[in-house]
């Protein structure tokens, strides 16, 4: 209704100033005008604006709290602006925006979160009140858009002056026609309409023209290239933007508008472009026809030798450059005589100003950072670098290397340039083509032939430097050896451990690995690489590049060894390093015959004690060095000249490991892949989790180690008959018979466990290290190391595996198989390791004395018939044939088998655990058809995560990455889709809001239920990004009770104008945005704010220290999320002198610091601590490492003279530990200089080690008070928690365990290195709305029931949630179940129905069978505990079986010789 009233008002209103029109001019003091009669609470009020003339204002819509009549229903308050709030979420109280002229960025805000304020300095930006920090946050409009407060949106600047910040307008005496209307300027005493090109750079109208007299501009104004007077405030801008602009015409001459900033047109003469530029853009630079200077030759430019400036700008000037020097006479100016006359008609000095277009008589006439020099404004201080200009210039070639010509001055370059892969250029002249492809090398200098001779006037191109008049190319620091660009973070590196994962350190830069090879060690040994360049660290500050012959000696260089890494047989070195005999990890230039790097060094070929396993042999490599290489029976003498190709098993493929470039154990590989013994990886598995898992079992048989096996083809009974005797296969060779047969038969009463030494080690080289002990990613827990003593490698029948299993996994080279499998050499297939089992329900009968005598007689008879054969026994050793229940082998006993799972006998696919007892079963089971089956309160349903596109996930993400064609979503890999938002306005602007009765405000039309500009149908944020949905109100309907309604959004989104949820793209606590976090981490100097890396700066501009769990060290306080030095104050009596504020430590000695007022030097040492005092000072001097402090009322005062007390500098507040110190700082610079890896602590003048992010080195992990308790599945092999307060989440709840590479399981988030539920990661008091799946909703649904891209609307909750939400049922009065089909009762009752195995969970109590200790919730999924195994969707307690390696056991020794094990 309000919109209709406003629309009628606008239609009736005429152009006269007396008729009130929204946005029209008015006289201040005019009475308010009621809108729609007296029954409404809206009226028009005349208020002043930034650009209103004196005594004038603009009509603005206002609202008054009017009581609704009793007979007429109240009309809900609506926003009269074009962007309307959806009617369903309209607040009960009016929401009229009022302008706050005092709003400033990063200051406290106390207005409605949905009202935006104009930025006082940048018309193309606006301020928004952040809901979390309650501070103003700066946002940016789209390109070529300006913010309009009245409309609360970014619009195309039709009347730009109304949107500009307030400027100082001259009085009538300075400008006779200052009363010209908007959009016009005074010229020759007349008001002339101006075009867009005549406006100032900030969009404001010029004050006057300066066509004939350049000095006619009033004070505080300057003459632009368009010959108009613009205010000096139009040149003010933030760091990083020289001049704010909207279109090219608003920039000074010679500049273009790029991203709302005026930038200089640069002449690129070398094959280098800005980072991320395209190769095509670089190629166009060399096309003469398309030269940006219209084919102007460099030789035609006037040359002038550099000259020094006589005056240097004062330190107080702020660097804000505005215009770029344009080389004069680039084009023929004879045809444009007006421009020539305008440039030089005033005086001879005006022509010499060149492209600056600014004449002056004093420094006040010039912009900031400029000085008046010979009648022209010249640059005095370079921008960003804050360095004084030393040389003037007119072209790029007048400046030195790493400088560019900027406003007529040579300034250091601050834009990082990247070298594009060089190409051979063909130079043409008179149809004669000459190609220069040969390199000219003089000594160690590779000559850059583009410049014949270099000097101060003729400089070398980029990436080259002048040496004795010759341009020598610099080493390729920015480009890696594999052709990829170096990483920008970190800036420098000394070792590869300083670089992120999947990268290494080259020439002080971190270089990423290629996908097909990790580093130079993976290259073929046979490849000929005669010369390589390596870096040799000769000091802490300089590096030299030295040419080394790759085929030279292999002696260990101490510079290649890790200084802090120690190694032994139990603690191996990182990949690509070899453990030396001295216990250091060194990088050697040798490789094993299979191409891998040796694990350890050894002494001689006959001594293998230093090798990590029996599969490694000490081998002589390159006739000089002994090292342990994996190759059974290998004897190599001499140098290695070829590489043996390492292949995965037939039919398998290689994938990248979870971290690093090569694997050592299978835990380094993503499941279900395994690592073969040659350092490569292979799959070869028949199925993956999507085709064979606990929640999706094989159609026939069982799922073992990730592949489907048959369980009924060749198997006999499910349980092995313990009374059946086994005999040796007569077809076996006689060489397999042991010498202890007779001894064993005579001493059959004594039982012993089998020993590995009884088995020929040469028959199976993989008999050991199936389950090696090691840290996460390199081994298994210690309690699993004895599986080799329990499991047996049973041989099959020559056709299939033992126990009736079918396998299609072919053994790899060297008879290798994944952990838990062994290679059946008869069929060359990988078969499962088995347990010898007997059923406790059918135990082996005790043999009486008569039965024992009969048994001995049978054995003696068999021994007489076959004197050399083994006695009949049930042994855990391999049987020569596998006949099962129908074996055709004569005299061959059934080999050990595993239990065959029976067919499903319970409803829902479950399995029976036994028969009922008088119609009753144990807790958690019910009697169905005389069988005990798992019982459920509701129909079980396995929850399978669906991707945003609706498809199923293919597996979990590995370090946030997925295979090609898949993307990581919620820590699972989903197929990549190209979906678009169906709600897109044609012009790409943001929708103003929802339509009300199918109508919108002026300038907007209703399209698809939304108000869009013109015929727009999109929902976009002010920065151009897509909105995910509408803001969620804190209450709706009668639940509000007259309370002010607030709006909020999900994590990572904020509620903006129009009540829509937009992504957060700024730092909530202030600071500049660097980019998104990498594995939850940020580089040094930046802090994590949300999911962004923000600059960690203190209020004084200094870089703060990162806090630890929100706590700072002594002497520091938490400010803007970082630790900043606390304020220092002291009296004049204890201060040591005035603080200059310049030089090292502000001019104060070590142990002192400038106070908060920058007046006195106050002590920062703990001088009151007697342990820090060493004694009185002698003549004001103290020993090295101590500082004198004149403590008031000191007992050392004699005759009124205070000699001073010497205080230890180690007592300085905030100083690092002594173990992290390296010495004193070099005080030559203000910040102090320290060796690489150390930072100067200026208050004490001591160098402390720098805190940087680095990879965890093996063997150097933090020492814990006790060994971790490993009790989770192997692929989640991490300690569950370390205990103490550190294991708690932010809300006090216990974490699920530590994060791995910043990642957690499905349904969890990484918080301070701990995996916590998403709800525990939200600030206290923040409203949250939960989706049926438990995820936090990102926003509310749009009025038409839709959401943004990647989300779907849950109509019953009116929330935008991730796709694949389970169906929900509303809770009715009296219904205490709150039932939904996914057993998720968060929105219903407090009762909790058990969830099946494989379903998502948050607590152990949610899983079925948890009360009996059979299940647990791990990584957000219900899993069986170690004492149980999975049957369908439930857990069944493992049975206890007796394991007998010798069936001939006397009854008296049964209790001592049997052992129990759970399977």
From Swiss-Prot:
InterPro entries in UniProt: CC_domain, Chitin-bd_dom, Chitin-bd_dom_sf, Cys_repeat_1
A GO molecular-function descriptor: chitin binding
Biased composition (Basic residues): 740-756, 843-853
Chitin-binding type-2 domain segment(s): 94-164
Paired cysteines (S-S): 141-154
Pfam families hit by this protein: CC (PF04942)
Record-annotated membrane-spanning stretches: none
Region (Disordered): 70-99, 720-773, 841-869
Entry keyword annotation includes Lipid biosynthesis: no
Protein name: Chitin binding domain (ChtBD2) containing chtb-1
Positions with biased composition (Polar residues): 722-734
GO CC field: extracellular region
Keyword Heme (UniProt): no
Keywords of the record: Chitin-binding, Disulfide bond, Signal
Extent of the signal sequence: 1-17
